[in-house]
Curated annotation (Swiss-Prot):
Belongs to the troponin C family. This is Troponin C, isoform 2. Gene3D superfamilies: EF-hand. Residues 11-46, 47-82, 87-122, 123-155 form the EF-hand domain. GO terms for cellular component: centrosome; cytoplasm. Ca(2+) 1 binds at residues 60, 62, 64, 66, 71.
Length: 155
C-alpha cells in the first residue's frame, strides 16, 4: 500500500484520527466502509459518491468492508489534498491579479523579477535572468497565469 500520509499535516492526521475513533464504536481499529461518506460530510469535505466508492474498493485491499485507520487516511487524503490544490490555485490567482494591475491576463517579466527577488534575496541578477528565461517560455517578455502557475507549483 503506497503511503500518502506525507501529503497531510500532523493536524490533518489528528483530525482524521478523532473522526475515525468516534466512528469506531467497538474500538476494533476499523470502521465500516459505509461510514466513510458520513465522516467526510462531517468534516465538510466535498466528494463524488461514485469516486468515493471506487476509492473504497481500491483502498479496502482485503475486501473486508471495513477500513483500518491507515486505509482510511489513504482514502481521506485523496479528498483533502485535492481541496488544498483548489485552494492554492485560488490564492495564486489572487496573487497574480494583484500584479496584473491592468487586468491584461499577464504581468511583465520585470515585475516577476521583483517578486522573485522578494521571495529570495540571495538570488543573483544572473540567476534571476535564467529563471525568467525558463518561466517566460515563449519569450514574450510577459508571464501569463499558466506560466505563473507552473512556476509556483512546479506542475
Amino acid at each position: 500500500m503506497d503511503n500518502i500520509d506525507e501529503d497531510l499535516t500532523p493536524e490533518q492526521i489528528a483530525v482524521l484520527q478523532k473522526a475515525f475513533n468516534s466512528f469506531d464504536h467497538q474500538k476494533t481499529g476499523s470502521i465500516p466502509t459505509e461510514m466513510v461518506a458520513d465522516i467526510l460530510r462531517l468534516m465538510g469535505q466535498p466528494f463524488d459518491r461514485q469516486i468515493l466508492d471506487e476509492l473504497i474498493d481500491e483502498v479496502d485491499e482485503d475486501k473486508s468492508g471495513r477500513l483500518e485507520f491507515e486505509e482510511f487516511v489513504q482514502l481521506a487524503a485523496k479528498f483533502i489534498v485535492e481541496e488544498d490544490d483548489e485552494a492554492m490555485q485560488k490564492e495564486l490567482r489572487e496573487a497574480f491579479r494583484l500584479y496584473d494591475k491592468q487586468g491584461n491576463g499577464y504581468i511583465p517579466t520585470s515585475c516577476l523579477k521583483e517578486i522573485l527577488k522578494e521571495l529570495d534575496d540571495q538570488l543573483t541578477e544572473q540567476e534571476l535572468d535564467i529563471m525568467i528565461e525558463e518561466i517566460d517560455s515563449d519569450g514574450s517578455g510577459t508571464v501569463d497565469f499558466d506560466e505563473f502557475m507552473e512556476m509556483m507549483t512546479g506542475e
